[in-house]
């Protein structure tokens, strides 16, 4: 129930006093105040109109109560901490005092034991006999007389006291010791207080306490073992009334007769309950037994060491020689089995290392040179033979891993990563591989069983060689890694971790590789790699391609290549495809620049008209202003649809895919790829200012894309230039002749620069200017026709490897394009100064002064720096691929 404004003011006025009173009364009052406070808060937070003074009063009261509660909580926490500290200190002092007392007592005990005289030898035997005869601690002086037997021991006095009798001269010492022992354990005191000094009654009560049944008692004669020689009734049917417990009564439980029993059997005497002693007498006997056990416990009981030695030391006759021999034989057999297991494990490790080497050999990397000329000749012969075989097999195959690159843009090509076979074929290969592995495991088990059945006399092989071999492999791998870092490698991009690739070993045959023409996956970005939810690296884009007609052996399938689109000089043609830009609010969009081509006119005709004159371009552009461009907006990466754009200008077919979506099969007949423009004089609409003037890059974002004469809003603001997809021509590159083609190398000898799919984004400042960071450029540099890997004839650990000579680092064509395009500001070339022949340092000083005067670097410096960046990026990419390949094969 909500309160009114007057009630709220009254409650706020007394809130602090009520809170303090509730704290003083107890928890129940605090709960009541909390309930009232909740109602007050709900009333204030409701829609009830309140005066500003009321709201101000509520704020002041709430802040005051909050501060007070915080102070009380802090004080309670401090009190709790102080209480805990005091209790911990008291407990620590108590433990310390106990430890000190225990230490002092142990020291005093040790001193007391050291000062004690030695125990006579006969006391041990007498004490043991006393503990076993507490029901009658009166030994006889004659060997034939024995005390009453007890359930604990049935031995007589003669054998038990024989050591004591042998060590003492008279019986007086034993009698005096037994008299003192009976006094110490309280036998005499119990006899005087409980039984009035009557030893016979004391012995009878002790028999009831520690003795046996009545039948055994009738057969014994207590008078023979008693020192007092008093006449004792040999047979007692009942216990005197003063020995019985006043709380217990003798009761008989009559057994019910059964039907098959005879009448004579039914009238049998019921069993008699055992007699009971008075509780005080039983307690006195129990205390006496305890004192008897504690009398010489600290002197005569064996220590823990004696118990351990006695338990572990077995007599020799108890050991069975046959069992000992069997145990020794089993231990030897287990040792041999362990040695064989270690041998098989070392063999498996060597096989795994060899498998990794073979898998690593399937990817191109620089071959280490050798000082031995014979080995170089053998390697060259094997390389040439393999290249010829590879070229023949590639010509016969329908689909090849090579791509068709146009002559002007061969330097922009990059190695692609594609699926090696169809999904169905890969599934069958996986089944076959699993079956082969199971067969290998079965054969390995059979071999291990045969090895275990061999003679036990054969010593296990030494495993030191395997360790030395592993060290040699490690040294060889380190040397190979050093050589790889010294020279720039060729390499192919591996598929994503989710690609169903199965690596199968072959005895003397290099694994074959097939490329599916209808399924292509772009390479993953360099490290660090961001993985998607399904395990596929972000940036992997499935794309549609068209299978080229296999008219000749040199026909190749079209490939999607990714690079930075930069304005190239007139000697090179401009990419005839779309670009991808990023901006707000759409993270990834596909901007189809082909929309600038008017309807009813082909791209070639339009570019011819554009190249002829500038006014014609403006007219053609304005004539097609009514045609709207198609923009694909997806929440993630959009497929490179510019490759699949048809001849129609107003349509742009796009396929929206997720960045983490795995590649799927696409029929080759679904799209049609338009051949690029081969003329070098044509200008792409991307670099046409008239086309750029039709777009408003500064307008706010909306849902549609508009293009017209006026400045209309666009659906994005192109602030970053990302990548460009280029559909290269079907003509092969000049570097890919049949004599140098190889399956192990998917890049031409003059390799292409590569840019990261994610991180090579440059800022677009104008339609003709863009800037890129130095760390965003990567490249694949070539090392000549011997860049491919050939099968090693000898293991790397046994070959003499010498470091390869450093080759001069030459920048790729991308560096020249960047410098010649004007995107990078460099200083002009300095006119060389003629220096006197005598002064060799004059030219250097003049060059340094000239370089200090100019804030920009020379083109040679920029070119050298970019070449170094490309080389370093290629090395890092090679190391990343090597680590990814090792992780994929389980190494």
Curated annotation (Swiss-Prot):
Biased composition (Acidic residues): 369-400, 427-457
Listed Low complexity bias regions: 542-559, 612-650
Entry keyword set: DNA-binding, Homeobox, Nucleus, Transcription, Transcription regulation
Secretion signal span: none
Disordered: region residues: 331-592, 606-671, 779-812, 836-861
InterPro entries attached to this UniProt entry: Mating-type_A-alpha/beta_1_N (IPR024333)
Residue ranges flagged as DNA-binding region: 111-189
Domain of life: Eukaryota
Pfam families: Mating_N
Main location: nucleus
GO cellular component assignments: nucleus
Residue spans of biased composition, Basic and acidic residues class: 331-360, 841-850
GO molecular function: DNA binding
Biological role stated in the UniProt entry: Specifies A-alpha-3 mating-type. May regulate the expression of genes specific to the homokaryotic cell type.
Stated family: Belongs to the TALE/M-ATYP homeobox family.
This protein's name: Mating-type protein A-alpha Z3
Organism: Schizophyllum commune
